[in-house]
């Protein structure tokens, strides 16, 4: 069998093997894993001499591992395996062996096997496990034995003590027992072995020393700390911390020694013990010496700077400060311990801020958690004593300084986009820290930041364009953030009132900024910041309107900037600025339109085959599509400033026409080419339609803001946009087979609603004909139904006749979509969306008292299909359809209320029927009982309906209870007789209590509770 196994492994891992043969080999090896005898053959193959190939030995050992970990081996088998591996290790790793030691990957696998045996036999069966491998490490000149011993110790920790791994309760108990046994039997000798190895190899083998230190760092979390914190051990580790290579290269031993101290400090212990330990280890001196060492001090700012060491020290300081803060947060600590902790905090704060200010952001980020903990603690203290308050200025200064671009940064360089993104992420973290400082001492932040900004403007006045853009950017960035102090409902405190001092300082900053001429500075980052700030603090310009012409002039100039990142971002910011200040800038609408008219022509570019599909859509995306998306903001901006209340309607129409006429001409030129299949022409038509819709959105948004309700645009405006709608409908009629064109038209239609008013209604049949073509997907139909809901709501008093004409063809398209075959997940999702929007559309019709249109002479032919479709949706309880089901039940309940006639039964303590049903539609009373009521019990009996455990199903149950009550109110005794004579006998239940609740309880809850109990008892 040995040869068969070896052959199978060789075939399976040979890339040149026949695929069919390889498949057979893998199948054979998988069978071996479950064969209770295979492990014996495999261990023999692994340990035999001469050795077979490494891949065969590795796979054999993997099969053995599987057998041990899955507990295939009994006690006798484990004993045999122990003896086999112990003999093998003694033969290969004894130091004087003839056999060569295994390569690293095989040693790892062997260590794993031995660790599994340790778990299974250390308690009973291999009590000498540690001694056996320690003996190898203690032999003179036996480096392989030392490495194996340390590998095993590391693996044991990973198996039984690694807190990052999730464990079952049984595994956790087993691991705790093993740790207790180790502490009892072998921990003293293990700790002594670490000392011996450090002493023996400190000047001989860095690899052994590094591994020993890492092993100590792992084990220290669960052993007696005094085994590590003693004079002998410290005297061995300290020299390693202070090592410096003359060449300036990294030192893994030194870094590991620092990490070991970090793990020691992180060990959980009483606050008083933690403070004592930090003092005993003299970590303040250690950290200070490390930060003063050449790799972190003399070589700062050079390629020799040791970032690995800096990160290691940062981890140590982060752990130290976090632990000291935890001591201070503990309200139960004695005064002596608190005093020591406060002194430690003062001792380590300079080191913390030095690392926080490190030029490498990864070093800075390492200490942010402890700085956050410190600031959180200070915020909880309340009124700060001088001991704490004197810490804040250096902390805030460090935060602000770190927000500055470093000297090597090259803003806007395409090659540095990743660095730029990382820096912006760091700025977000720093902003949170700055907020934390403000929450502790707001006035300190106000004063420091005010001085920073004032000094910047003073320097700008003196140096002009010679001033470093990084300093300007920092000051502008702080102005941008300053509003969180000055304005209400911002920052950590969520203030309901602004800070008067901060608001006053912000107003001064804004005035200085506008007056400084900074908008003419040469660096693009500064220009962007300027526009961002003007847009953010638009309320300043509402109060200080004298600055608006100057700022608006700057915006008009900057939207023409030749830097693409500025130009496209400025289009959006310009739109935001004029939108929020439309009332103040409307008087110069004509001038603004003329000034930016050269930016309005649309030039669609078809993406090439090499276009980056993953291109970001943010401001760093300069693709043609992204540029056009930004260009649309200009159209909306024009709509905003053209439609203010101060602008005469005739002028509004004139402005709209001046922008749209070139678009009409351009579209008429491209439609014929688009019909011929020219992709550029299709895209051009798409873009023009989007621009028309976006312009309309600007007008509609302005009217809505003025009226605070459904806009009623002036005839001069609606006439112009009626022409736009006609032009779009022409394009839609010619190109409605093209999905992108339909999407653009649908978007434009939704935006035109606000400026067309009731004038849109006569065009509705054309919109439906165009947007719901044979090519339309269910997703498109769902989106259009959502738009029609808006139309019905806005024009409910005028829409009846139009709705009466268009309803049947509309519903026929919807019915067709509902019955389309499903091919894959996307189709299923689109169908769910169509179901939801269909029943929501019918719900809106009924809610707005337009239900008569559903049963009018024009639409009677589709009424049966309408009801049938709604019932089908109501009883479809698949995942993703429960919302549609609930709405469908609500729709049926509304139909029952509207067409069931007057109430003939009263619900109360003495229920009674006062007459025969008189439905508005003949026969509808019996229809409700048979179909609506029958539907309710069909759903209740569905195994997938679980209202006891699912919230959405519970909502459906509420609707079911509601519709049952409506049916009873409309039909009275006829419904009761049906329940007693048909429903209850068919279900085999006693419905007496249900009938009592249904006829006496005006609330749905008792009925729902009874139904829940029924379902719970029957499942």
Curated annotation (Swiss-Prot):
The keyword Cytoplasm applies. The keyword Lipid metabolism does not apply. GO terms for cellular component: cytoplasm; nuclear matrix; nuclear pore. One of its GO terms (biological process) is tRNA re-export from nucleus. It comes from the Eukaryota. Keywords: Cytoplasm, Nucleus, RNA-binding, Transport, tRNA processing, tRNA-binding. It is found in: Nucleus; Cytoplasm. It holds the Pfam family Xpo1. Its main location: nucleus. One of its GO terms (molecular function) is tRNA binding. tRNA nucleus export receptor which facilitates tRNA translocation across the nuclear pore complex. Involved in pre-tRNA splicing, probably by affecting the interaction of pre-tRNA with splicing endonuclease. PANTHER family: EXPORTIN-T, EXPORTIN-T/LOS1. Belongs to the exportin family. This is Exportin-T.
């Amino acid at each position: 069998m040995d040869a068969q196994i070896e052959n199978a492994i060789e075939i399976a891992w040979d890339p040149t093997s026949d695929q069919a043969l390889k498949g057979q080999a893998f199948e054979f090896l998988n069978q071996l894993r479950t064969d209770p005898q295979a492990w014996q053959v495999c261990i023999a193959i692994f340990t035999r001499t001469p050795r077979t190939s490494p891949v065969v030995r590795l796979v054999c050992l993997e099969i053995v591992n599987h057998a041990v970990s899955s507990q295939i081996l009994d006690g006798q088998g484990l004993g045999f395996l122990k003896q086999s591996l112990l003999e093998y290790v003694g033969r290969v790793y004894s130091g004087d062996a003839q056999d060569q030691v295994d390569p690293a990957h095989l040693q790892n696998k062997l260590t794993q096997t031995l660790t599994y045996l340790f778990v299974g036999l250390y308690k009973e069966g291999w009590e000498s496990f540690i001694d056996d491998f320690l003996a190898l490490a203690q032999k003179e000149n036996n480096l392989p034995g030392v490495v194996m011993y340390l590998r095993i110790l590391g693996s044991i920790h990973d198996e039984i003590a690694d807190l990052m791994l999730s464990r079952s309760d049984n595994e956790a108990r087993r691991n705790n027992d093993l740790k207790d046994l180790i502490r009892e039997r072998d921990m003293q000798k293990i700790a002594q072995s670490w000392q011996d190895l450090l002493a023996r190899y400190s000047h001989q083998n860095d690899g052994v020393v590094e591994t020993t230190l890492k092993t100590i760092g792992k084990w220290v979390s669960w052993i007696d700390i005094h085994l590590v914190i003693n004079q002998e051990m410290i005297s061995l580790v300290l020299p390693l911390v202070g090592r410096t290579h003359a060449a300036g290269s990294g030192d893994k031993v030194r870094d590991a020694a620092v990490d070991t101290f970090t793990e020691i400090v992180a060990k959980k212990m009483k606050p008083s013990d933690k403070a004592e330990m930090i003092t005993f280890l003299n970590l303040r001196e250690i950290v200070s010496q490390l930060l003063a060492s050449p790799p972190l001090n003399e070589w700062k700012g050079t390629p020799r700077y040791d970032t690995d060491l800096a990160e290691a020290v940062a981890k140590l300081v982060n752990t130290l400060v976090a632990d000291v803060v935890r001591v201070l947060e503990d309200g139960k600590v004695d005064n002596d311990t608190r005093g020591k902790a406060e002194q430690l905090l003062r001792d380590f704060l300079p080191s913390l801020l030095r690392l926080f200010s490190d030029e490498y952001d990864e070093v800075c980020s390492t200490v942010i958690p402890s700085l956050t903990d410190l600031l959180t603690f200070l915020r909880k203290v309340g009124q700060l004593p001088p001991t704490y308050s004197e810490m804040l200025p250096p902390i805030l200064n460090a935060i602000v300084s770190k927000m500055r671009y470093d000297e090597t940064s090259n803003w806007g360089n395409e090659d540095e986009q990743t660095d730029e993104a990382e820096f912006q992420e760091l700025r977000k973290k720093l902003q949170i820290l700055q907020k934390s400082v403000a929450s502790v001492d707001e006035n300190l932040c106000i004063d420091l930041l005010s001085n920073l900004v004032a000094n910047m403007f003073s320097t700008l006045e003196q140096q002009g364009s010679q001033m470093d853009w990084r300093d300007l950017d920092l000051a502008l960035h702080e102005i941008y953030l300053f509003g969180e102090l000055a304005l209400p409902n911002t920052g950590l405190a969520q203030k309901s009132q602004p800070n008067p001092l901060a608001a006053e300082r912000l107003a001064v900053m804004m005035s200085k900024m506008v007056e400084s001429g900074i908008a003419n500075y040469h660096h693009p980052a500064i220009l962007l910041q300027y526009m961002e700030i003007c847009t953010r603090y638009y309320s300043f310009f509402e109060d200080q309107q004298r600055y608006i012409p100057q700022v608006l002039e700057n915006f008009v100039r900057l939207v023409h900037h030749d830097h693409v990142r500025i130009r496209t971002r400025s289009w959006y910011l310009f739109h935001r600025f004029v939108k929020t200040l439309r009332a103040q800038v409307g008087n110069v609408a004509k001038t603004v339109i003329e000034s930016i008219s050269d930016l309005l022509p649309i030039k669609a570019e078809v993406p090439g085959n090499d276009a980056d599909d993953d291109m970001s859509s943010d401001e760093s995306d300069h693709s043609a599509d992204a540029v056009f998306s930004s260009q649309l903001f200009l159209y909306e901006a024009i709509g905003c400033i053209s439609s203010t209340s101060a602008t005469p309607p005739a002028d509004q129409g004139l402005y709209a026409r001046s922008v749209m006429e070139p678009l009409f001409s351009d579209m008429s030129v491209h439609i014929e080419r688009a019909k011929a299949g020219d992709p550029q022409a299709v895209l051009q038509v798409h873009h023009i339609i989007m621009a028309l819709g976006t312009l309309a959105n600007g007008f509609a948004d302005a009217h809505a803001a003025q009226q605070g309700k459904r806009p009623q645009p002036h005839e001069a405006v609606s006439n112009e946009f009626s022409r736009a709608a006609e032009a779009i409908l022409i394009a839609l009629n010619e190109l409605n087979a093209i999905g992108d064109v339909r999407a653009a038209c649908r978007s434009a239609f939704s935006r035109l609603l606000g400026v067309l008013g009731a004038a849109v209604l006569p065009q509705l049949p054309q919109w439906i004909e165009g947007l719901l073509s044979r090519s339309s997907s269910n997703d498109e139909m769902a989106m259009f139904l959502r738009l029609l809901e808006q139309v019905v709501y806005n024009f409910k008093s005028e829409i009846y006749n139009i709705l009466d004409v268009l309803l049947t063809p509309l519903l026929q398209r919807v019915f067709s979509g509902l019955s389309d075959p499903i091919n894959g997940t996307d189709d299923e999702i689109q169908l769910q969306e169509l179901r939801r929007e269909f029943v929501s559309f019918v719900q809106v019709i009924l809610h707005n008292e337009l239900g008569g249109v559903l049963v009018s002479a024009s639409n009677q032919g589709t009424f049966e299909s309408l009801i049938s479709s709604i019932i089908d949706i109501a009883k479809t309880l698949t995942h993703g359809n429960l919302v549609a089901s609930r709405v469908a039940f609500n729709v049926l309940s509304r139909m029952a209320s509207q067409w069931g006639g007057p109430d003939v039964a009263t619900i109360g303590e003495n229920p009674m029927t006062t007459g025969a049903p008189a439905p508005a539609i003949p026969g509808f009373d019996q229809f409700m009982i048979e179909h609506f009521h029958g539907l309710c019990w069909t759903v209740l009996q569905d195994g997938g309906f679980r209202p006891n455990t699912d919230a959405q199903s519970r909502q459906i149950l509420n609707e079911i209870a509601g519709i049952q009550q409506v049916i009873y109110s409309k039909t009275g005794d006829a419904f009761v007789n049906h329940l007693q004579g048909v429903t209850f006998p068919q279900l085999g239940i006693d419905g007496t209590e249900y009938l009592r609740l249904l006829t006496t309880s005006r609330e749905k809850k008792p009925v729902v509770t009874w139904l829940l109990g029924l379902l719970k008892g029957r499942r």
